């Protein structure tokens, strides 16, 4: 059976003059393959460097279905295909071919593919590239043939004429010999036909494929832009057949894959050389849309707003009156005679169905112009009435039958109003209407619209003139019949409607509706309104239609918008997974399957509208996340108390389920300070943590050179810009205000940094310095100089037993042995002996030795204290040395570890701040060069203003320039608005930074997690570019313990509340403890207070939820009127207004590293065995004191003796009378100057 089938599929091409014939050609299999990420191309000629660029154009969507076609010859010519059907061109084509024998030779582009229309041929004839646009007589099976490896025939077309484009590229030699083995070549092309140009893009990749289409990413470059100027709706491929003879040609193996381009948004990544290195199809899936929204290939964990959507209508409601009669247009248009123009006649048409398509599609009319309505829309409209006015005029006068025209016909015969709604239809009747017809050539006053004057004279003057119509006169003077159809808009029930069938009325669903020509989308519900009999529609205060009368049932219906809301994407971060969940905000899950436009999105999106993982929340419909009926600590807050988390293995999810789970948010999670019934967890141990917090306090200052940004060097544009008044001045004034605000923010924040001074201890009184006598008040344990003079001081290292020894010993040296201490199981004494101790122990030793002989050894017992105290002191020395050694080793090891961690911490902090500085500086540079950047979103750039002026007259040129100015002013206004918003955010951040500077740096905050994570110890500020960095040192709980707690304790009818802390119970008793650390204390009146009784009063806090304020809108028509009066370019597409790559600071990795370093630092805390410092003061012996006192007495006696021997005792105020040693002789004074004598007093 297979052999027979293969035989039927055998293809054979025989020679024919000019063309070849293929017999028994099988139908293409048209299998589908995925395009992967191929087909990206440079859609413009602009150089971009190191930037992410969003662009809207016709692209091949990623993972599109490509249709596969073959040139195939397998199994000894029994299995052959030669697929070259005519394919749809659409909005553009992606074409890829895998081959090895140069089978694909080119393409034919056109519409009808016959000689009635032009077609374009781009082919490779093995020596040249031929490009031609002609009327071709194309072959039914266009192909090339190769015989024995040499090009033989060109069976593409038989003849050509009316050629408008002919181009032959330089010669080359194509290898036409058939090859065996795998496919070696992958050639990709993109074809776009825009504005008369066929653009061709191409890339080549070497492959080694036995079959199929290779996955991957490819970028195509432009190679041709051909000015064909023809209509291209279809195309087909020109391929090659091969033979070892001169006939019976057969195909060789090749495959090509085609797909159509679609208008979509791509994000292209350019490197510093301007090369596209990566791309994202923004409509491929929610994650791709998110990447385009935030303009980043890497997305951090969180929930992001991406776009908006409106629920798609599921049905169409068409409601027209029940009218079946046909409108009598034939009687109007086929009348035997038309009246004179000054006596024009009117026919009212009503209660009928009007098929305007018969008129619109007629080829006999020379004029068919409509005003206020589109001819193609008439079939969908209804009117209260239609009036047909008929008359006869010259062909050249038809132009006067239009709104706002003047002339003899428009002024004195038939006048249309300026707001005319209707159509003017005219056709030549030179053969039918002959003879004399009349028109009014003069009238004292011009006619009003639709005014008719049948008089033939005015004040005795004959005002009518004659038309002499004959077929032989020039065309402009020949008879022309005119029918003016005036449409009366609905102010009463419709009586004239298009031939459209009505459908059933659908309520409470999102539908497309058409009521008597009023088209729209919304939800129809029964209304409580009451219309007057002549009223058909209702409008709200903003002039929007909000109600309608059903023309069949006459029921009043309210029209409300279909569900509309935002779309948010929940992602665990691209570094963790590509899984996402989608939240349709404020939408019921029943509406979600209809909210996605399936024709605009790929199947990857539609998967989120089906399946079991659909979760209705108060925030909207969450799809793509598994709902877990439990409460956990919130990871990604979604809203309305719902959170999401990503888990690879957890109790939150079972094997095989989605990685994203949704659950109800709890106040806390396991292993955290959480609340469960009346239990509370209180920390019992802590660890040190360092948190880095970067807070911006200013942004880069910018100003805009308005004239240069908008007009460049164009003088005409600058003059036109003056008409916009002080816009630019106000803009820069706003930017100046922002700059002043930044200076103010910086000043206020860093003004908080003050030098902290300590008050010195008071050491003098009344000018006398007692610091050497009195103890230092800041060091109450320190002795004064006098005390140090009067006592010998010995300082020893204390391993932990000397202090207790000193307290035991006191001033009694005899207690030395009794006060021995225990340390690590050993009895120890300090390695210190006073003279008294030495004398005592020496006396005991000598006595014991001397009496040992005659006390039969009993006296040797006196040697025991001496030996014991020596042994104990050796123990003390040993343990002290061991502790010192171990501590020294720990200090060395841990200090080295701490130093390395601190060094790494500083390096990490430096890297983070450097990254912050780079981003801020780059952004500032981008903002400061705003005046040099020219947006391309408004259709014209300032560099071509002179070209606009040269191609257009002054008025048209000013219109085009005005469009440019309007668009750019919108761009600048939006930019300044963004800056104002950012300035407000920075202001709030600066205020918070100032608060943290006061509370965290200059004080110790009691607020948990306000100054870092945990309980605050200290903070250090550091200036950063446009901000400040805080290094918060905190201690965080490392161990916790659950206690039963109560807000108050009721005792004897009174409620006792803790003054500070909380009441806790250990199971048997109640205590009071600090909230942030477990330190139980007995409950007393000092740490509690009594307030009220034991009754519990429950209060409800106001929980009113306010709806968003909706501004009162003016009339929509008035808004449009004001807009069109003040702006000549209402259709402004802002697009990517700023062109600024606003980089986002990402120092999370560095901060995580800092946290890890802080943890390591905390682990490196040195747990040394405490070595105290023991000081012992030893009193002098009695003979020292005796000598000291004798020396003082001797000094006093010698002083008195000297005074008496020198007769100076009188100076002691009469204490002795040894002479007048203090008396002075006045006569010994000699005058220095004559008449002057010095006196000493």
Curated annotation (Swiss-Prot):
The chain crosses the membrane at residues 1182-1202. Disulfide bonds join 19-139, 134-163, 282-292, 327-352, 370-423, 382-497, 808-819. Residues 14-1181 are extracellular. HAMAP family: BETA_CORONA_SPIKE. Belongs to the betacoronaviruses spike protein family. Bat coronavirus 279/2005 is highly similar to SARS-CoV (SARS-like). This is Spike glycoprotein. It comes from Bat coronavirus 279/2005 (BtCoV).
